Design a protein with these regions (language model features):
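Surface-exposed binding/hinge segments that line
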Residues: 97, 130-189
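Detector for C-terminal structural segments
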Residues: 301-332, 384-393, 419-529
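Alpha-helical secondary-structure segments
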Residues: 111-118, 159-165, 238-240, 275-324, ...
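Structural transition elements
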Residues: 315-362, 381-386
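Gly/Pro-rich hinge or "lid" segments in bacterial periplasmic/extracellular proteins
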Residues: 149, 169-240, 247-248
Length: 529
Protein backbone atom coordinates (compact mmCIF):
# COMPACT_ATOMS: atom_id res chain seq x y z
CA UNK A 1 0.00 0.00 0.00
CA UNK A 2 2.77 2.41 0.94
CA UNK A 3 4.67 1.57 -2.26
CA UNK A 4 1.53 2.31 -4.28
CA UNK A 5 1.10 5.70 -2.57
CA UNK A 6 4.71 6.65 -3.22
CA UNK A 7 4.39 5.68 -6.87
CA UNK A 8 1.19 7.70 -7.18
CA UNK A 9 2.84 10.74 -5.57
CA UNK A 10 5.81 10.52 -7.93
CA UNK A 11 3.48 10.17 -10.92
CA UNK A 12 1.48 13.22 -9.80
CA UNK A 13 4.65 15.30 -9.34
CA UNK A 14 5.85 14.26 -12.80
CA UNK A 15 2.52 15.24 -14.35
CA UNK A 16 2.60 18.62 -12.62
CA UNK A 17 6.13 19.28 -13.88
CA UNK A 18 5.14 18.38 -17.46
CA UNK A 19 2.00 20.52 -17.23
CA UNK A 20 3.89 23.56 -15.94
CA UNK A 21 6.58 23.13 -18.56
CA UNK A 22 3.91 22.96 -21.25
CA UNK A 23 2.46 26.23 -19.98
CA UNK A 24 5.89 27.83 -19.97
CA UNK A 25 5.91 28.19 -16.17
CA UNK A 26 8.60 27.04 -13.78
CA UNK A 27 7.61 27.16 -10.10
CA UNK A 28 11.24 27.95 -9.28
CA UNK A 29 11.44 30.91 -11.66
CA UNK A 30 11.51 34.41 -10.18
CA UNK A 31 10.40 37.49 -12.03
CA UNK A 32 13.63 39.46 -11.79
CA UNK A 33 14.43 43.08 -12.52
CA UNK A 34 18.00 44.32 -12.92
CA UNK A 35 18.65 47.98 -12.10
CA UNK A 36 21.86 50.01 -12.12
CA UNK A 37 21.95 53.36 -10.32
CA UNK A 38 24.68 55.89 -9.71
CA UNK A 39 25.19 57.19 -6.20
CA UNK A 40 25.38 55.55 -2.81
CA UNK A 41 23.14 53.99 -0.18
CA UNK A 42 24.53 54.79 3.26
CA UNK A 43 21.23 54.60 5.11
CA UNK A 44 17.69 53.26 4.81
CA UNK A 45 16.40 55.53 7.58
CA UNK A 46 13.64 57.63 5.95
CA UNK A 47 14.54 60.69 8.01
CA UNK A 48 18.18 60.52 6.95
CA UNK A 49 18.04 59.70 3.23
CA UNK A 50 19.63 62.25 0.93
CA UNK A 51 20.52 60.53 -2.37
CA UNK A 52 18.26 59.35 -5.17
CA UNK A 53 19.44 55.78 -4.60
CA UNK A 54 18.60 55.96 -0.88
CA UNK A 55 15.14 57.38 -1.53
CA UNK A 56 14.56 54.67 -4.15
CA UNK A 57 15.42 51.87 -1.73
CA UNK A 58 13.21 53.39 0.98
CA UNK A 59 10.28 53.45 -1.47
CA UNK A 60 10.53 49.66 -1.61
CA UNK A 61 11.25 48.63 1.97
CA UNK A 62 8.69 51.04 3.48
CA UNK A 63 5.18 52.07 2.50
CA UNK A 64 3.62 55.51 3.03
CA UNK A 65 0.01 56.62 3.25
CA UNK A 66 -0.14 56.96 -0.53
CA UNK A 67 1.93 55.80 -3.49
CA UNK A 68 2.47 57.45 -6.86
CA UNK A 69 1.05 55.95 -10.04
CA UNK A 70 2.91 56.16 -13.33
CA UNK A 71 0.71 59.10 -14.40
CA UNK A 72 1.68 61.13 -11.32
CA UNK A 73 -1.59 60.62 -9.45
CA UNK A 74 -1.62 59.22 -5.91
CA UNK A 75 -3.11 55.83 -5.06
CA UNK A 76 -4.04 54.50 -1.64
CA UNK A 77 -1.29 52.54 0.08
CA UNK A 78 -1.22 52.40 3.90
CA UNK A 79 -4.30 54.62 3.87
CA UNK A 80 -7.56 52.88 2.89
CA UNK A 81 -9.29 56.25 2.62
CA UNK A 82 -9.08 59.84 3.79
CA UNK A 83 -11.28 62.89 4.31
CA UNK A 84 -10.44 66.57 4.15
CA UNK A 85 -12.10 69.37 6.12
CA UNK A 86 -11.35 73.11 6.02
CA UNK A 87 -11.94 75.18 9.16
CA UNK A 88 -13.01 78.83 9.34
CA UNK A 89 -9.44 79.87 10.17
CA UNK A 90 -8.22 78.30 6.91
CA UNK A 91 -6.54 75.29 8.50
CA UNK A 92 -7.16 71.95 6.82
CA UNK A 93 -7.59 68.64 8.66
CA UNK A 94 -6.88 65.36 6.89
CA UNK A 95 -8.21 62.20 8.54
CA UNK A 96 -6.72 58.96 7.24
CA UNK A 97 -8.21 55.53 7.87
CA UNK A 98 -5.35 53.03 7.80
CA UNK A 99 -5.31 49.42 6.70
CA UNK A 100 -5.83 46.94 9.50
CA UNK A 101 -3.94 44.17 7.69
CA UNK A 102 -0.58 45.96 7.32
CA UNK A 103 2.32 44.37 9.18
CA UNK A 104 5.85 45.34 10.02
CA UNK A 105 8.50 42.86 8.97
CA UNK A 106 8.70 41.66 12.59
CA UNK A 107 5.03 40.62 12.39
CA UNK A 108 3.56 43.43 14.50
CA UNK A 109 0.75 45.67 13.25
CA UNK A 110 1.52 49.02 11.61
CA UNK A 111 -0.53 51.69 13.40
CA UNK A 112 -1.24 55.39 13.18
CA UNK A 113 1.03 55.89 16.19
CA UNK A 114 3.96 54.80 14.00
CA UNK A 115 3.24 57.72 11.66
CA UNK A 116 2.95 60.16 14.57
CA UNK A 117 6.30 59.01 15.92
CA UNK A 118 7.99 59.10 12.50
CA UNK A 119 6.75 62.57 11.56
CA UNK A 120 7.65 64.12 14.90
CA UNK A 121 11.04 62.42 14.75
CA UNK A 122 11.55 63.85 11.26
CA UNK A 123 11.22 67.46 12.47
CA UNK A 124 13.04 66.93 15.78
CA UNK A 125 16.28 68.98 15.70
CA UNK A 126 18.03 66.09 17.47
CA UNK A 127 17.36 63.91 14.42
CA UNK A 128 19.12 66.52 12.28
CA UNK A 129 17.23 65.40 9.21
CA UNK A 130 18.03 67.06 5.86
CA UNK A 131 14.36 66.50 4.97
CA UNK A 132 12.61 68.16 7.92
CA UNK A 133 11.00 70.88 5.83
CA UNK A 134 9.00 68.23 3.97
CA UNK A 135 6.46 68.81 6.77
CA UNK A 136 6.64 72.61 6.79
CA UNK A 137 2.93 72.85 5.89
CA UNK A 138 1.81 70.96 9.01
CA UNK A 139 0.48 73.18 11.79
CA UNK A 140 2.97 73.55 14.63
CA UNK A 141 5.99 72.94 12.38
CA UNK A 142 7.82 76.14 13.35
CA UNK A 143 7.63 75.27 17.05
CA UNK A 144 8.47 71.62 16.40
CA UNK A 145 11.73 72.33 14.57
CA UNK A 146 12.88 74.34 17.58
CA UNK A 147 12.52 71.28 19.79
CA UNK A 148 8.86 71.16 20.79
CA UNK A 149 7.96 68.22 18.58
CA UNK A 150 4.60 67.63 20.28
CA UNK A 151 3.46 70.94 18.78
CA UNK A 152 3.37 69.25 15.36
CA UNK A 153 -0.32 68.70 14.68
CA UNK A 154 -0.26 65.01 13.79
CA UNK A 155 -2.21 62.71 16.11
CA UNK A 156 -3.62 59.18 16.34
CA UNK A 157 -7.16 59.08 17.82
CA UNK A 158 -6.91 55.28 17.61
CA UNK A 159 -4.62 52.62 16.15
CA UNK A 160 -5.98 52.96 12.64
CA UNK A 161 -6.90 56.66 12.42
CA UNK A 162 -4.34 59.36 11.66
CA UNK A 163 -5.21 63.07 11.79
CA UNK A 164 -3.00 65.77 10.31
CA UNK A 165 -3.78 69.48 10.59
CA UNK A 166 -2.23 71.76 7.97
CA UNK A 167 -1.74 75.49 8.46
CA UNK A 168 -3.60 76.15 5.22
CA UNK A 169 -4.49 74.72 1.85
CA UNK A 170 -1.76 72.50 0.39
CA UNK A 171 -2.66 70.97 -3.00
CA UNK A 172 0.51 68.86 -3.13
CA UNK A 173 0.14 67.33 0.35
CA UNK A 174 -1.45 64.04 -0.77
CA UNK A 175 0.51 63.54 -3.99
CA UNK A 176 3.94 64.62 -2.79
CA UNK A 177 4.23 64.72 1.00
CA UNK A 178 2.20 61.56 1.68
CA UNK A 179 4.20 59.62 -0.93
CA UNK A 180 7.69 60.83 0.02
CA UNK A 181 10.52 58.67 1.32
CA UNK A 182 11.14 61.07 4.22
CA UNK A 183 7.62 60.76 5.65
CA UNK A 184 7.45 56.96 5.75
CA UNK A 185 6.35 55.42 9.07
CA UNK A 186 9.07 54.01 11.27
CA UNK A 187 8.77 51.75 14.28
CA UNK A 188 9.84 53.44 17.52
CA UNK A 189 10.92 50.13 19.06
CA UNK A 190 13.28 49.46 16.14
CA UNK A 191 14.82 52.94 16.27
CA UNK A 192 15.36 52.67 20.03
CA UNK A 193 16.90 49.21 19.78
CA UNK A 194 20.08 50.14 17.94
CA UNK A 195 21.75 53.30 16.61
CA UNK A 196 22.34 51.57 13.26
CA UNK A 197 18.88 50.00 13.11
CA UNK A 198 18.41 50.80 9.41
CA UNK A 199 21.77 49.38 8.36
CA UNK A 200 21.61 45.94 9.95
CA UNK A 201 19.59 42.90 8.94
CA UNK A 202 19.33 42.06 12.64
CA UNK A 203 17.66 45.31 13.65
CA UNK A 204 15.89 46.61 10.55
CA UNK A 205 12.09 46.70 10.55
CA UNK A 206 10.13 47.89 7.50
CA UNK A 207 6.55 47.78 6.27
CA UNK A 208 7.13 47.91 2.52
CA UNK A 209 6.36 45.51 -0.32
CA UNK A 210 9.99 44.38 -0.46
CA UNK A 211 12.66 43.36 2.01
CA UNK A 212 16.39 43.48 1.65
CA UNK A 213 18.07 40.07 1.48
CA UNK A 214 21.58 38.85 0.81
CA UNK A 215 24.80 40.37 2.12
CA UNK A 216 24.07 43.69 3.84
CA UNK A 217 27.79 44.48 4.05
CA UNK A 218 27.97 44.72 0.25
CA UNK A 219 27.45 48.44 -0.32
CA UNK A 220 27.51 48.10 -4.11
CA UNK A 221 24.69 45.57 -4.43
CA UNK A 222 21.25 45.46 -2.83
CA UNK A 223 18.90 42.55 -3.39
CA UNK A 224 15.21 43.11 -2.73
CA UNK A 225 12.66 40.29 -2.54
CA UNK A 226 8.90 40.54 -2.21
CA UNK A 227 7.75 40.35 1.40
CA UNK A 228 5.27 37.51 1.83
CA UNK A 229 3.36 39.32 4.60
CA UNK A 230 2.82 42.47 2.51
CA UNK A 231 -0.91 43.12 2.24
CA UNK A 232 -0.89 43.49 -1.56
CA UNK A 233 1.88 41.07 -2.46
CA UNK A 234 -0.08 39.39 -5.29
CA UNK A 235 -0.18 42.63 -7.29
CA UNK A 236 3.57 43.20 -7.27
CA UNK A 237 5.51 42.87 -10.51
CA UNK A 238 9.08 41.69 -9.90
CA UNK A 239 9.68 39.00 -7.29
CA UNK A 240 13.27 40.13 -7.04
CA UNK A 241 15.01 43.43 -7.75
CA UNK A 242 18.79 43.45 -8.11
CA UNK A 243 20.03 47.00 -7.55
CA UNK A 244 23.67 47.62 -8.47
CA UNK A 245 25.35 50.89 -7.48
CA UNK A 246 28.06 51.97 -9.90
CA UNK A 247 30.15 54.96 -10.90
CA UNK A 248 29.11 57.01 -13.90
CA UNK A 249 31.38 55.35 -16.45
CA UNK A 250 30.41 51.82 -15.41
CA UNK A 251 26.75 52.77 -15.30
CA UNK A 252 26.93 54.22 -18.82
CA UNK A 253 28.39 50.93 -20.03
CA UNK A 254 25.51 49.02 -18.41
CA UNK A 255 22.90 50.56 -20.72
CA UNK A 256 21.32 47.80 -22.78
CA UNK A 257 22.80 45.08 -20.57
CA UNK A 258 20.37 45.52 -17.68
CA UNK A 259 16.68 46.39 -17.56
CA UNK A 260 17.01 49.91 -16.16
CA UNK A 261 19.87 52.39 -15.74
CA UNK A 262 19.27 55.43 -13.52
CA UNK A 263 21.71 58.34 -13.31
CA UNK A 264 23.57 57.43 -16.50
CA UNK A 265 22.94 55.81 -19.87
CA UNK A 266 25.08 57.56 -22.45
CA UNK A 267 23.94 59.66 -25.38
CA UNK A 268 20.61 57.87 -25.74
CA UNK A 269 19.52 58.51 -22.16
CA UNK A 270 16.30 60.36 -21.43
CA UNK A 271 16.47 63.31 -19.03
CA UNK A 272 14.55 63.04 -15.77
CA UNK A 273 14.04 65.43 -12.89
CA UNK A 274 16.43 66.08 -10.02
CA UNK A 275 15.50 68.17 -6.97
CA UNK A 276 18.75 70.18 -6.75
CA UNK A 277 19.45 73.63 -8.19
CA UNK A 278 22.57 75.78 -7.91
CA UNK A 279 22.14 79.44 -7.04
CA UNK A 280 24.14 82.60 -6.40
CA UNK A 281 22.99 84.40 -3.27
CA UNK A 282 23.37 88.16 -2.98
CA UNK A 283 23.09 89.33 0.62
CA UNK A 284 20.45 92.06 0.71
CA UNK A 285 22.02 93.41 3.90
CA UNK A 286 25.32 94.05 2.08
CA UNK A 287 25.23 97.78 1.31
CA UNK A 288 27.49 97.34 -1.74
CA UNK A 289 24.80 95.19 -3.39
CA UNK A 290 21.90 97.57 -2.80
CA UNK A 291 21.40 98.61 -6.44
CA UNK A 292 19.07 96.19 -8.28
CA UNK A 293 20.74 97.22 -11.56
CA UNK A 294 24.10 96.04 -10.18
CA UNK A 295 22.65 92.67 -9.18
CA UNK A 296 20.99 92.22 -12.58
CA UNK A 297 24.27 93.07 -14.29
CA UNK A 298 26.07 90.39 -12.27
CA UNK A 299 23.42 87.90 -13.37
CA UNK A 300 23.39 88.86 -17.05
CA UNK A 301 27.10 88.24 -17.69
CA UNK A 302 27.06 84.74 -16.21
CA UNK A 303 27.61 82.08 -18.87
CA UNK A 304 25.30 79.48 -17.36
CA UNK A 305 25.93 76.87 -20.03
CA UNK A 306 29.63 76.84 -19.17
CA UNK A 307 28.88 76.93 -15.44
CA UNK A 308 26.60 73.90 -15.76
CA UNK A 309 29.21 71.96 -17.74
CA UNK A 310 31.82 72.85 -15.13
CA UNK A 311 29.69 71.44 -12.31
CA UNK A 312 29.10 68.16 -14.13
CA UNK A 313 27.63 66.46 -17.16
CA UNK A 314 24.31 65.95 -15.40
CA UNK A 315 23.64 69.67 -15.10
CA UNK A 316 21.83 72.11 -17.36
CA UNK A 317 21.77 75.90 -17.44
CA UNK A 318 19.01 77.27 -15.22
CA UNK A 319 15.98 78.71 -17.01
CA UNK A 320 14.41 79.78 -13.72
CA UNK A 321 14.62 78.82 -10.06
CA UNK A 322 12.11 75.95 -10.32
CA UNK A 323 13.76 73.03 -12.17
CA UNK A 324 12.35 70.56 -14.67
CA UNK A 325 10.47 67.64 -13.10
CA UNK A 326 8.39 69.83 -10.78
CA UNK A 327 4.65 69.70 -11.52
CA UNK A 328 2.00 72.41 -11.39
CA UNK A 329 -1.24 71.85 -9.49
CA UNK A 330 -2.84 70.99 -12.83
CA UNK A 331 -0.27 68.24 -13.45
CA UNK A 332 1.86 70.00 -16.08
CA UNK A 333 5.61 70.42 -15.75
CA UNK A 334 6.06 73.85 -14.13
CA UNK A 335 9.12 74.85 -16.16
CA UNK A 336 7.59 73.79 -19.48
CA UNK A 337 4.26 75.47 -18.73
CA UNK A 338 5.83 78.78 -17.69
CA UNK A 339 8.75 78.97 -20.07
CA UNK A 340 12.30 80.21 -19.57
CA UNK A 341 12.93 83.29 -17.45
CA UNK A 342 16.63 83.33 -18.27
CA UNK A 343 18.18 83.61 -21.74
CA UNK A 344 21.00 81.09 -22.14
CA UNK A 345 21.36 81.33 -25.93
CA UNK A 346 25.11 81.59 -26.74
CA UNK A 347 24.31 83.77 -29.76
CA UNK A 348 22.89 86.52 -27.53
CA UNK A 349 25.61 86.44 -24.86
CA UNK A 350 27.46 89.46 -26.25
CA UNK A 351 24.20 91.42 -26.35
CA UNK A 352 23.45 90.46 -22.76
CA UNK A 353 26.88 91.66 -21.67
CA UNK A 354 26.24 95.02 -23.32
CA UNK A 355 22.93 95.23 -21.49
CA UNK A 356 24.71 94.46 -18.22
CA UNK A 357 27.19 97.27 -18.81
CA UNK A 358 24.31 99.68 -19.45
CA UNK A 359 22.67 98.61 -16.18
CA UNK A 360 25.94 99.20 -14.36
CA UNK A 361 26.07 102.76 -15.69
CA UNK A 362 22.46 103.30 -14.57
CA UNK A 363 23.53 102.28 -11.08
CA UNK A 364 26.22 104.99 -11.16
CA UNK A 365 29.23 102.78 -11.79
CA UNK A 366 30.71 104.48 -14.85
CA UNK A 367 34.45 103.99 -14.39
CA UNK A 368 37.15 102.40 -12.25
CA UNK A 369 36.87 105.13 -9.64
CA UNK A 370 33.17 104.59 -9.07
CA UNK A 371 33.62 100.81 -9.12
CA UNK A 372 36.18 101.12 -6.34
CA UNK A 373 33.34 102.36 -4.13
CA UNK A 374 32.13 98.76 -3.98
CA UNK A 375 35.10 98.09 -1.70
CA UNK A 376 35.88 94.39 -1.24
CA UNK A 377 33.36 92.02 -2.79
CA UNK A 378 33.90 88.43 -1.70
CA UNK A 379 32.35 85.28 -3.15
CA UNK A 380 31.90 82.53 -0.55
CA UNK A 381 31.65 78.94 -1.77
CA UNK A 382 32.16 75.30 -0.91
CA UNK A 383 35.67 74.23 -1.95
CA UNK A 384 34.19 71.67 -4.32
CA UNK A 385 32.78 74.57 -6.38
CA UNK A 386 36.15 76.29 -6.93
CA UNK A 387 36.06 76.05 -10.74
CA UNK A 388 32.64 77.65 -10.98
CA UNK A 389 33.71 80.38 -8.56
CA UNK A 390 36.76 81.19 -10.70
CA UNK A 391 34.61 81.29 -13.83
CA UNK A 392 32.24 83.81 -12.24
CA UNK A 393 35.17 85.87 -10.97
CA UNK A 394 36.66 86.07 -14.47
CA UNK A 395 33.33 86.96 -16.10
CA UNK A 396 32.60 89.79 -13.67
CA UNK A 397 36.06 91.29 -14.04
CA UNK A 398 36.35 90.95 -17.82
CA UNK A 399 32.79 92.03 -18.68
CA UNK A 400 32.01 94.52 -15.91
CA UNK A 401 35.36 95.50 -14.39
CA UNK A 402 34.21 94.27 -10.97
CA UNK A 403 36.94 92.54 -8.98
CA UNK A 404 35.74 89.80 -6.67
CA UNK A 405 37.79 87.96 -4.08
CA UNK A 406 37.24 84.22 -3.70
CA UNK A 407 36.84 82.43 -0.37
CA UNK A 408 36.49 78.66 -0.48
CA UNK A 409 35.50 76.92 2.76
CA UNK A 410 34.41 73.49 3.95
CA UNK A 411 30.72 72.68 3.61
CA UNK A 412 29.99 72.90 7.35
CA UNK A 413 31.53 76.39 7.50
CA UNK A 414 29.57 77.48 4.43
CA UNK A 415 26.33 76.45 6.11
CA UNK A 416 27.24 78.32 9.30
CA UNK A 417 28.22 81.47 7.41
CA UNK A 418 25.02 81.40 5.37
CA UNK A 419 22.89 80.97 8.49
CA UNK A 420 24.63 83.92 10.14
CA UNK A 421 24.49 86.13 7.04
CA UNK A 422 28.29 86.45 6.95
CA UNK A 423 28.79 86.90 3.21
CA UNK A 424 28.29 89.31 0.33
CA UNK A 425 28.01 86.77 -2.51
CA UNK A 426 27.70 83.03 -1.99
CA UNK A 427 27.26 79.88 -4.03
CA UNK A 428 24.90 77.24 -2.67
CA UNK A 429 22.69 74.37 -3.77
CA UNK A 430 19.01 74.16 -2.88
CA UNK A 431 17.27 70.78 -2.80
CA UNK A 432 13.48 70.58 -2.83
CA UNK A 433 11.91 67.95 -0.58
CA UNK A 434 8.50 67.77 -2.22
CA UNK A 435 7.30 68.07 -5.80
CA UNK A 436 5.92 71.58 -5.89
CA UNK A 437 7.24 74.97 -6.97
CA UNK A 438 6.83 76.27 -3.43
CA UNK A 439 9.70 74.00 -2.33
CA UNK A 440 11.98 76.39 -4.24
CA UNK A 441 10.06 79.63 -3.66
CA UNK A 442 9.05 79.43 0.02
CA UNK A 443 12.60 79.76 1.42
CA UNK A 444 12.90 83.34 0.15
CA UNK A 445 9.93 84.76 2.03
CA UNK A 446 10.92 87.44 4.55
CA UNK A 447 9.85 85.34 7.54
CA UNK A 448 11.42 82.04 6.46
CA UNK A 449 14.40 80.80 8.46
CA UNK A 450 15.98 79.50 5.23
CA UNK A 451 16.11 83.01 3.73
CA UNK A 452 19.90 83.18 3.81
CA UNK A 453 19.96 86.04 1.29
CA UNK A 454 17.91 88.07 3.80
CA UNK A 455 15.61 89.10 0.99
CA UNK A 456 12.84 91.42 2.13
CA UNK A 457 10.56 91.94 -0.83
CA UNK A 458 7.03 92.86 0.17
CA UNK A 459 5.45 92.16 -3.22
CA UNK A 460 7.00 88.69 -3.22
CA UNK A 461 5.71 87.94 0.28
CA UNK A 462 2.21 89.00 -0.75
CA UNK A 463 2.23 86.77 -3.85
CA UNK A 464 3.41 83.77 -1.85
CA UNK A 465 0.83 84.40 0.86
CA UNK A 466 -2.00 84.66 -1.67
CA UNK A 467 -0.78 81.49 -3.42
CA UNK A 468 -0.73 79.61 -0.10
CA UNK A 469 -4.32 80.57 0.66
CA UNK A 470 -5.75 80.13 -2.82
CA UNK A 471 -8.52 77.56 -3.23
CA UNK A 472 -8.19 77.68 -7.02
CA UNK A 473 -5.48 75.49 -8.52
CA UNK A 474 -5.26 77.67 -11.63
CA UNK A 475 -4.90 80.81 -9.55
CA UNK A 476 -2.27 79.25 -7.30
CA UNK A 477 -0.19 78.22 -10.31
CA UNK A 478 -0.45 81.78 -11.68
CA UNK A 479 0.64 83.36 -8.38
CA UNK A 480 3.63 81.03 -8.12
CA UNK A 481 4.58 81.85 -11.70
CA UNK A 482 4.49 85.59 -10.94
CA UNK A 483 6.43 85.09 -7.71
CA UNK A 484 9.23 83.23 -9.47
CA UNK A 485 9.46 85.92 -12.15
CA UNK A 486 9.67 88.65 -9.50
CA UNK A 487 12.33 86.72 -7.60
CA UNK A 488 14.51 86.29 -10.69
CA UNK A 489 14.10 89.94 -11.71
CA UNK A 490 15.05 91.18 -8.23
CA UNK A 491 18.32 89.23 -8.52
CA UNK A 492 19.04 88.60 -4.86
CA UNK A 493 18.53 84.92 -5.64
CA UNK A 494 20.23 84.18 -8.97
CA UNK A 495 19.66 80.70 -10.50
CA UNK A 496 22.74 79.19 -12.13
CA UNK A 497 22.06 75.54 -12.99
CA UNK A 498 19.79 72.62 -12.24
CA UNK A 499 20.79 69.00 -11.96
CA UNK A 500 19.13 66.36 -14.14
CA UNK A 501 18.84 62.58 -13.89
CA UNK A 502 19.56 60.63 -17.10
CA UNK A 503 17.97 57.20 -17.39
CA UNK A 504 17.50 54.33 -19.85
CA UNK A 505 14.71 51.74 -19.64
CA UNK A 506 14.43 48.75 -21.96
CA UNK A 507 11.48 48.97 -24.34
CA UNK A 508 9.82 45.83 -22.97
CA UNK A 509 9.96 47.07 -19.36
CA UNK A 510 6.82 48.99 -18.40
CA UNK A 511 5.53 50.49 -15.16
CA UNK A 512 8.61 52.06 -13.54
CA UNK A 513 7.47 55.15 -11.62
CA UNK A 514 9.58 58.27 -11.02
CA UNK A 515 8.58 60.93 -8.51
CA UNK A 516 10.13 63.58 -10.77
CA UNK A 517 12.80 64.27 -8.16
CA UNK A 518 15.16 61.33 -8.57
CA UNK A 519 13.46 58.51 -6.64
CA UNK A 520 11.92 55.50 -8.41
CA UNK A 521 9.52 52.67 -7.58
CA UNK A 522 9.67 49.37 -9.48
CA UNK A 523 7.00 47.33 -7.69
CA UNK A 524 4.56 47.76 -10.57
CA UNK A 525 6.98 46.84 -13.36
CA UNK A 526 5.89 44.27 -15.94
CA UNK A 527 7.38 43.06 -19.21
CA UNK A 528 5.59 43.29 -22.52
CA UNK A 529 6.49 41.41 -25.67
Amino acid sequence: MRIWRRAAALLLALCMTVLLAACGEDPNDEKKLSVVMTGTVRTMDPAKVSTAAERTVVQHVFENLMRLNADGTAAHAMARSYTQETALDGSVTYTFQLRTDARWSDGTTVTAHDFVYAWRRLVDPETDSPNADALSMVAGYEQAVLGGTEALQVTAPDDHTLQVVLSGSCPYFIGSVCTAAATMPVQEKAVAAHSNWSGSSLWFVGNGPYERTGDWSDTARLTLHTRAAYHDVKRLGPDRIDLLLKGRQEADASAGKVDIVIGAGGEDAAQGGDPTVGILLVNQMATSMGHPELRRALSLVIDRETAAQTVGQDCRAAEGLVPYGIRTDEGEEFRTANGALIDNDPSTYSERCQGAQALLRQAGYTNAVTLSALNTVTLLYDKSMAQVARQLQQSWESKLGIKVQLEGVESYELTARLENGEFVLALMELTGHYNDASAYLDPWRSSDMRNYGMQYLNAYDILMKIAAGSSSLDARDAYLKDAERLLVENSNIIPLYSRVQPYVIRDEVMGAVSDGMGAWYFGGVNRVS
